[in-house]
Amino acid sequence: MLSANVVYELQTVWFPNMTDAGLGRLMDLLESGSPLLIHGCFTRATPMGCLATHVGWHHPRTEHMVHEAGITWLTRVAGLNPATSAVIREWDYRGPHDWRLRSDLLDVLKAEQQSRQRKSERAAKRQPDLVVV
């Protein structure tokens, strides 16, 4: 189970700064147990990166970066200190081989994706129909 601090940081800092593409990428990597998702460093060799790096590679402000995408996304986009980020600390401590961590993160990511889809559907319903005169 994820700690309350990790869930809070995801919901209040990561998700508001994460693109749909970044969210989808993390979900794909976690679901497949991909070796491209690493821990202990931001980037080992492209395309291997940590959570923040894969999010950074899918964000318009940092997608052009290679090795610096994760740290730059985390510090300049999300406004977090990598040394004190609850998400990064938990990921680095437990790592991608902890199936429970992957499963718990995936559950939170899926909930966010569903929330975004519901908001998008509600917004689409609010769009007034064009009236032809």
Give each language-model segment a name:
Residues M1-V133:
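Short, glycine-biased loop/turn motifs at secondary-structure junctions and
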